[in-house]
């Protein structure tokens, strides 16, 4: 369990770096910390609610909000992103060219 906890903490540290009004993908976070996009998704689903982790800023590689276990996107995520000034197109996608956060090298 310690390994999982350690990688989750690394994921949370990177997610905290994403500035307001920007998003990134599960895969990008995974490449930064050395894990799979799926593991990043698990970490986001497990993130402690009161630790200031901006989980809403992580989306899938198409720029869409990923489906949750119940088969629908979390409507709170879209609301939070729109409050940060992020726009969605008519298909529910975010323009990655406009809003994608590029990690600092």
PLM feature spans:
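Nucleic acid-binding interface residues in structured DNA/RNA-binding domains
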Residues: 1-105
């Amino acid at each position: 369990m310690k390994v999982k906890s350690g990688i989750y903490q690394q994921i949370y540290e990177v997610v905290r770096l994403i500035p307001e009004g920007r998003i990134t993908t599960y895969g990008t976070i995974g490449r930064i910390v050395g894990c799979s996009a799926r593991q990043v998704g698990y970490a986001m689903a497990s993130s402690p609610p009161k630790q200031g982790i901006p989980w809403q800023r992580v989306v899938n590689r198409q720029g869409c909000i990923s489906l949750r276990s119940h088969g629908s996107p979390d409507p709170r995520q879209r609301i939070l992103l729109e409050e940060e000034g992020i726009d969605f197109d008519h298909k529910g996608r975010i323009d990655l060219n406009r809003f994608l956060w590029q990690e600092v090298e």
